[in-house]
Amino acid sequence: MNLVLSVVFYVCLSFQYYLLGNECLDLFGYNKNTRTILISGFLSTFFLTFIIGFVCQVLHLSWTLYFILQSILFVVVDGYLLFKNRKNIFCRHEIKLQRILKNNWVLILFAGVFISFSIANQLPYYDLNYDDVYYIGKVVNHVGTPHLMNEDYFNGSLVHINGLDLIRVINTYELSYSYFGTLFHIYLPYFCRVTMSLHNYVLFGIVYKQLASLFVKEKYSQYAIVPFFYFLIPAGFLQTGIYECIRVYSYDLWQFQTAAFYGGSIVRMMAVPILIIYSLPLVEKMEFKKIIYIVLMSISMISFSTIYVQVVVLFFIAAITIKCVYCFVEAFKAKETKWMIVSILGILVIVGFLLATRYLNINTEEFVYNVTRYHGFQQEWYDHDSLLKYGFVVFALIFVLSKNSQSRSIVGMVLVLYVLVWKEIFTVLLTITSFNYFFVTMRTVSSIQYLILFFLGICALRIYESIFKKMYFIPNLAAVGLVMLVCVFFRHNVNEM
């Protein structure tokens, strides 16, 4: 029954995402396709849950009152959307299932295989997946509580809060899960571990396919996520038992495989590519309404995890840098000396700011502790990680293979992010923006590792495009590659045992 109700939930949520996402993109002046509409709908829906959830958690209102207020907001918003689109909703639209399957079979396979491995994995049941006790406990215990945020969700004991625990109050996604699970009568642990995990895997595929479409032809874009099947390997949970040269040292990688429903997983898996997708138009032309949309989108993202704060700060630095570079190139082409000078000054200011952070003298015990802990992981993990060690090679290759300024701007943004986390050059900046939590920085590094892995897929596709003008071979190559990948690593792990 949980499976059937989950299907009903997906159908209703798809309509919600499409109608709301379409309205938001029209309102803020974005070009749109089905993928950007769904992504925008996801962000907008959880922005609506943040509005009510944040207020109710701050005021410690009851679950019943929260549920009523949240339902009223959705009824009003959805009622408006249905009324506005009433003519289109009842029109007959031809759905070509065969074309959908052909253009998205890799995404479907990705979501299906990862959710199957996640469900089959026994670690969540034996070890409670490290953080499930807190997050699933919070989702379950929200329901029916007389006062939100009134208990310790690790053990269920009542707490007396003096002041405001801003970090926990901002995170409203657990409350959203409680609301949707209760609304659709889905068993809440199942809703978290299965329903929302599958939702997030599908959304991950949609986000990266949209990003890939900015580099390669539409018909090739789904194949860009093939490298992420690498995370399926049996040894991947702890990244042990495989050759060091192909090992990915990625912090909290187990969450990608077994806890995709975590708010931190959503930020780590999708925040940077989503920021790129909706910030890219601003590189060519600054528009105030698009900046407002990114602010609202950021509020939605921070409702999942406050680790997003560091992500958006570092991304802002990267985006401003690339904006200055873009302006310089355009001014150079137009031979506008004044704007060339302004652009160069902008770049120098950014570089000066970054270099100045290296000389900040912060000697608090907490700061030193987190710098030391991060340094330990740098030596043990990142100095040996192939993606980070040879990242510059990947960036050089994809920059050469990129065919327009738009795709090169994306590469430039990620390159700046890569430089910011490379070899502890800007450790002080990273520690400050992580609010002295070293693991926050490591999760940001994981986001960049995912993008480098994605770029490897793009490089392969661009090379394929240049050699073969048709896509006859690529579906077969992808299928054979996936089978070989799983077989080889299963065989290797059997030998290791």
Regions inferred by a protein language model and the residue ranges of each:
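Membrane-interface helix-loop junctions at the exits of transmembrane helices
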Residues: 48-52, 116-124, 227-251, 351-366, ...
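Membrane-helix boundary/interfacial segments in multi-pass membrane proteins
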Residues: 3-8, 58-66, 128, 242-267, ...
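Signature aromatic-anchored transmembrane alpha helix within multi-pass, membrane-resident enzymes
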Residues: 340-348, 462-495
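Transmembrane catalytic cores of multi-pass membrane glycosyltransferases
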Residues: 1-5, 12, 127-136, 140, ...
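Membrane-interface alpha helices of multi-pass inner-membrane proteins
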Residues: 57, 291-308, 317-320, 347-351
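Active-site lumenal/periplasmic loops and adjacent helix-entry segments of GT-C-fold
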Residues: 116-270, 493-497
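Membrane-embedded, hydrophobic transmembrane alpha-helices
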Residues: 1-100, 360-373, 412, 420
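Membrane-interface transmembrane helices that cradle and orient dolichyl/undecaprenyl
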Residues: 267-268, 272-292
